[in-house]
Amino acid sequence: GRVYIDDFCARHRIPLVKSPHVGDDGVVQAIRSSGLDWLFIVGWSQIAPQPVLEAPKRGVLGMHPTLLPEGRGRASIPWAILKGLPCTGVTLFKLDEGVDTGPILAQESVAISDRETARTLYDKINVAHQDLIRRVWDDLVTDRIRLQPQDDSQATTWSARRPQDGRIDPQSMTVAEIDQLVRA
């Protein structure tokens, strides 16, 4: 399972604010007026501006589909496969003004099989998101969380993937490289 946010919010009578940009004035005002302690931003590839980071009482938490500080940036699932990593994971962290640089609350590892595809890894990452939230929820609502700064000396940044990055060239690529590219 996937849960569609519109249906979930309607079923549970939860106010839903939609916007194409996380920093819109209406979004910031809705967050402030809600009295939220924490705001979760998951699956949003925009950088939250300072007014959003300051709107909830405690801050903004994000999920990133790598074990930060490795793999800051974009296209985490394809890159994990392309790099031949044995595992990746999910990081719950407090957002700051940087790109995936905030202090870490918790992480959940995800094994990458030899035949992993982007689809299967995406599904594993979704399950890890849920497991991670369940694991930290009590500490989060009782204000017993511990944030650990990231070790910037261990950080790597992965760039966005472009259509031409998926081009297969059988003249210069090995069969293994082509296989990896197709699966990613």
Place the predicted regions along the sequence by residue:
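One-carbon transfer enzymes
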Residues: G1-A184
